[in-house]
């Protein structure tokens, strides 16, 4: 590849052209995610509403983030997503920041690894960089791009890549092992594949030990970490998801397909839509078989270097071991999971970990060419020119697949538009709810909480306000345990969603306690909504908004807002009362003041209607 370039341009220009070309996949991913991102809660990601609602209602417990889900304890994923949701009112668009950081952070690790193994001042580096870039940003893993929940996989990949970078390039430095162990813990408590990284590192270091039969000190360190992490992870975990498991042949077919999908998909992109799972496994199975054969051949060549703990050899063994463990473990659970069977190995999301088998060989071959381990006479198939030609063929095929893959991102874009339209006001089920989540009760709970808390697709919506007319200010009434204040009003429109009123603090800094409010439709036994306001946090004459469940047909209906407090008048929050005017509504009713029965006072109340 560089040989052809050098006949037209100088080697230096060719070098930088290839480096620039390596940035194209990264830019492609940026545009692809921006165009195709699902920007509303979808499928398993909707379960985050339970933690968000608990946080808003004051019922959140940190221990709940530890709960298992699909053979994982996604503590890191839940923590990051919850904190982001709290900060942004669950604006799903903001979650892609963390997805970008994970993917580009992983690329930074792989670039640094290429610099350590190959160096920058040679023609092999840009070829290696281009190959790695095409694999990492590959649209074959599109499922990990257009859905923010796949931050779980992307973050795990980053933590694993960082761990491998540290321990394989500096295998004798304890500080690197400590940082890598922390990173592996984070990976394990994001997705189960983090445990496979523990095992891959242990095996690699034990194979590279001076005496194979004697435990290596670094391997022992990682074994201890694995055991402690497992002791924290496994209790209470339901590991069985299916009563049937694959046969040896099915497991082999799945694993080969899983390992070959990253390469096979780049040679010829197989997906036609975002949810399609190709049924044919032939191409990926062949690619997986070829990669295993080449890995075995390279491993034999690398074994003497592994005993010396050469970084390239350790990368080859560690990457391959991790990919194989991921393939077999996933196949054990998924090869007979549903009607797709072993074709589940073609799943787009799995390629993120299956690609390590290919990446390890790319790095090892690159290091071998730079350091001249193979003479062209003895290893003609691995001669520099042959490798560059193969890399050029791979790059051309991959760029074609990148172009063909845009249809998947376009499909995701259209799906997101349709999905967003499903989030209409109200709780009446619509046929499109099945796209949000397969369980109707889960969709109903999700929409109810989102509308009540005004989160996600129901956040920052436009509201129509109607303010009750009042006269001049008369006096405050104390919201203490001594009285209840009731105000009736008639809704002027459909879609009642908010009530706004003002409080005063006649007791100043002494204000404490809680104000309890409840809204009911007159004549109904069940309240529409209720809540608490911390009196100590209220500001003098500041507007307080009470959020309600969306009321579809509210126009013309009469509602009653009841307010009460705790404690004594001397520490209570105040509610300003006004003289009525001709167009004022019904007067307030004070439980301890008979004069109010004669219409002496009204409260200022603003009703807001969602549209």
Question: Which positions does each model-derived feature cover?
Answer:
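Intrinsically disordered, polar/acidic, low-complexity terminal segments
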Residues: 5-71, 85-128, 174, 203-205, ...
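Transmembrane alpha-helix segments characteristic
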Residues: 25, 127-135, 222-230, 307-336
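Short hydrophobic/aromatic helix or loop-helix immediately within or flanking a transmembrane segment
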Residues: 64-89, 253-265
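Aromatic- and kink-enriched transmembrane "portal" helix at the membrane-lumen/periplasm boundary
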Residues: 125-159
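Membrane-interface transmembrane helices that cradle and orient dolichyl/undecaprenyl
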Residues: 160-177
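Membrane-interface alpha helices of multi-pass inner-membrane proteins
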Residues: 176-203
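Hydrophobic alpha-helical membrane-interfacial segments at the cytosolic entry of transmembrane helices
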Residues: 213-234, 317, 389-390
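Beta-sheet-rich sandwich/jelly-roll-like modules and their strand-loop junctions
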Residues: 462-523, 531-558, 562-611
């Amino acid at each position: 590849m560089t040989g052809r370039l050098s006949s037209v341009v100088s080697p230096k220009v060719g070098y930088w052209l290839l480096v620039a070309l390596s940035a194209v996949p990264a830019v492609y991913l940026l545009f692809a995610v921006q165009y195709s991102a699902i920007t509303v809660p979808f499928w398993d990601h909707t379960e985050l509403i339970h933690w968000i609602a608990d946080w808003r209602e004051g019922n959140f417990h940190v221990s709940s983030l530890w709960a298992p889900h699909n053979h994982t304890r996604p503590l890191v994923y839940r923590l990051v997503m919850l904190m982001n949701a709290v900060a942004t009112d669950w604006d799903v668009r903001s979650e892609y920041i963390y997805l970008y950081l994970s993917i580009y952070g992983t690329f930074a690790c792989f670039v640094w690894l290429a610099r350590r193994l190959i160096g920058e001042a040679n023609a092999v580096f840009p070829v290696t960089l281009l190959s790695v870039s095409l694999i990492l940003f590959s649209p074959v893993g599109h499922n990990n791009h257009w859905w923010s929940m796949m931050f779980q996989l992307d973050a795990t990949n980053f933590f694993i890549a960082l761990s491998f970078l540290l321990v394989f390039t500096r295998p004798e430095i304890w500080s690197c092992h400590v940082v890598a162990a922390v990173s592996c813990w984070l990976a394990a408590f994001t997705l189960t594949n983090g445990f496979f990284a523990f095992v891959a590192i242990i095996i690699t270091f034990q194979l590279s030990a001076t005496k194979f039969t004697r435990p290596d000190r670094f391997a022992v360190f990682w074994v201890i970490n694995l055991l402690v992490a497992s002791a924290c992870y496994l209790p209470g975990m339901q590991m069985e998801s299916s009563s049937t498991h694959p046969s040896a042949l099915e497991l082999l077919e799945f694993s080969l397909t899983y390992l070959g999908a990253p390469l096979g998909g780049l040679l010829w992109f197989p997906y036609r839509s975002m949810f399609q799972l190709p049924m044919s496994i032939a191409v990926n199975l062949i690619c997986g078989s070829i990669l295993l054969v080449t890995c075995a051949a390279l491993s034999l060549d690398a074994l003497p270097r592994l005993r010396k703990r050469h970084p390239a050899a350790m990368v080859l063994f560690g990457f391959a071991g991790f990919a194989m463990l991921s393939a077999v473990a996933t196949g054990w659970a998924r090869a007979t999971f549903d009607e797709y069977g072993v074709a589940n190995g073609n799943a787009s999301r799995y390629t993120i970990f299956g690609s390590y088998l290919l990446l390890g060989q790319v790095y090892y071959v690159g290091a071998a060419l730079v350091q001249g381990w193979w003479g062209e006479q003895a290893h003609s198939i691995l001669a520099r020119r042959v490798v560059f030609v193969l890399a050029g063929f791979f790059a051309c095929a991959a760029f074609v697949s990148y172009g063909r893959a845009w249809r998947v991102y376009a499909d995701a874009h259209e799906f997101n538009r349709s999905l967003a339209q499903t989030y209409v006001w109200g709780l009446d089920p619509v046929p499109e709810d099945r796209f949000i989540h397969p369980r109707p009760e889960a969709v109903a709970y999700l929409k109810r909480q989102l509308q009540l808390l005004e989160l996600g697709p129901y956040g920052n919506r436009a509201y129509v306000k109607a303010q009750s007319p009042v006269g001049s200010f008369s006096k405050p009434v104390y919201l203490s345990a001594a009285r209840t204040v009731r105000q009736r009003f008639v809704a002027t429109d459909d879609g009642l969603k908010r009530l706004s009123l003002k409080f005063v603090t006649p007791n100043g800094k002494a204000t404490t306690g809680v104000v309890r409010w409840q809204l009911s439709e007159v004549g109904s036994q069940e309240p529409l909504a209720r809540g608490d306001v911390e009196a100590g946090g209220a500001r003098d004459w500041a507007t307080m908004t009470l959020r309600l469940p969306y009321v579809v047909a509210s126009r013309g209906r009469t509602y009653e807002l009841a307010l009460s407090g705790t404690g004594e008048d001397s520490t209570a929050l105040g509610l300003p009362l006004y003289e009525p005017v001709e167009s004022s509504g019904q007067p307030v009713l004070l439980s301890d003041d008979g004069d109010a029965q004669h219409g002496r006072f009204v409260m200022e109340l603003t009703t807001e209607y969602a549209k």
